[in-house]
């Protein structure tokens, strides 16, 4: 009898967990606040963002402050510059904003400096080096910009908050920024030199634009530092692979194949799993980080898999899926214990940036 009572108490505790996620819908100028509980995900609120009701301003990147009190949103479609907007998680109301660069995209806040680091993707501009904007989120002031590569994306901070990492999609490089010194500390070419030996001269010539600038075959779109080891993992969107980089040696330590068009990557907080969206196939892949074995590929609810947010207890992955045409976006919930899709909810069109907010015990 005692065992039965304990079982029921534990079961009730597990079932009473609730998880909250924010997701941006780029073609609708909305952000949805979602709640996942008892294996069901629901939309609690749909927040209209942007200033001009007749224009699509393109909410792209979204992140929650480490203290959970604020969320930040990049509006990519500016005239010409985009901007960063700060919101309260308590009320989902605007608290401030600042202008950034061309097509501001992904971002994170450092737990050490308190600054927010946002890459300016420059999607529609000429293929030349762009920047990382460094913002004081208290005053919402852009402190400085740091020049990196062409079409930088995937801005992520090291677990200790001392370094910011991003990849340049068109120049095929990994950049490490000193979060305290506010300058590029190291740059790594991600191209596979072994492949280059076998490609034709015509293919190599095609890697350069008319102005002589390199066009990457790897086309990296995301980087995520390992939470416990000095490693980072990069999505090779053009080369259909994940690239592992040893941050101590500052060199590529491994490559493994994926489906077509890996886009975003995240690592579970317990450091056991690597999750990747396979954008061109509308799938989500799960790998064991211990041996890099593919554990499961899961078909998403609709097409164009995009972003990933993982719960703080490493039990669930929340996947934003853009959809095509006039379809609504979708957020899929995947169990990281049995590798199955367990719930989905419709949000605004072209669901993209996604961020985990909090977990609560009811």
What does each model-identified segment do?
Residues 3-13:
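Sec-dependent N-terminal signal peptides
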Residues 16-362:
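Predominantly soluble domains enriched in secretory-pathway, periplasmic, or organellar proteins
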């Amino acid at each position: 009898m005692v065992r039965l009572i304990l079982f029921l108490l534990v079961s009730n505790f597990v079932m009473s967990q609730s998880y909250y996620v924010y997701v941006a819908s780029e073609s609708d100028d909305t952000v949805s606040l979602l709640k996942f509980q008892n294996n069901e995900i629901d939309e609690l609120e749909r927040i209209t963002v942007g200033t001009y009701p007749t224009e699509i301003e393109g909410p792209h990147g979204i992140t929650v402050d480490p203290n959970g009190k604020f969320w930040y949103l990049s509006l990519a479609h500016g005239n010409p510059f985009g901007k960063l907007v700060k919101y309260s998680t308590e009320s989902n109301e605007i608290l401030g904003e600042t202008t950034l660069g061309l097509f501001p995209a992904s971002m994170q806040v450092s737990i050490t400096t308190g600054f927010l680091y946002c890459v300016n993707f420059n999607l529609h501009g000429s293929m030349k080096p762009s920047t990382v904007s460094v913002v004081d989120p208290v005053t919402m002031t852009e402190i400085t910009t740091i020049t990196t590569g062409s079409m930088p994306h995937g801005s992520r901070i090291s677990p200790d908050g001392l370094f910011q990492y991003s990849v340049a999609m068109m120049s095929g490089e990994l950049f490490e920024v000193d979060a305290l010194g506010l300058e590029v500390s190291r740059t790594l070419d991600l191209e596979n030199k072994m492949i280059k030996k076998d490609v034709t001269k015509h293919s190599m010539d095609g890697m350069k634009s008319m102005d002589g600038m390199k066009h990457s075959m790897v086309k990296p779109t995301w980087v995520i530092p390992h939470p416990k080891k000095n490693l980072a993992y990069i999505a090779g969107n053009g080369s259909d692979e994940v690239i592992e980089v040893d941050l101590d040696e500052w060199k590529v330590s491994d490559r493994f194949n994926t489906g077509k068009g890996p886009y975003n990557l995240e690592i579970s907080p317990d450091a056991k799993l690597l999750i990747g969206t396979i954008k061109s196939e509308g799938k989500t892949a799960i790998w064991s980080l211990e041996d890099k074995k593919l554990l499961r590929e899961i078909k998403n609810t609709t097409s164009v898999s995009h972003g990933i947010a993982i719960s703080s207890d490493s039990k669930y992955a929340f996947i934003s899926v853009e959809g095509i045409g006039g379809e609504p976006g979708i957020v899929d919930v995947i169990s990281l214990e049995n590798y199955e899709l367990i719930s989905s909810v419709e949000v605004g069109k072209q669901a993209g940036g996604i961020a985990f907010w909090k977990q609560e015990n009811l």
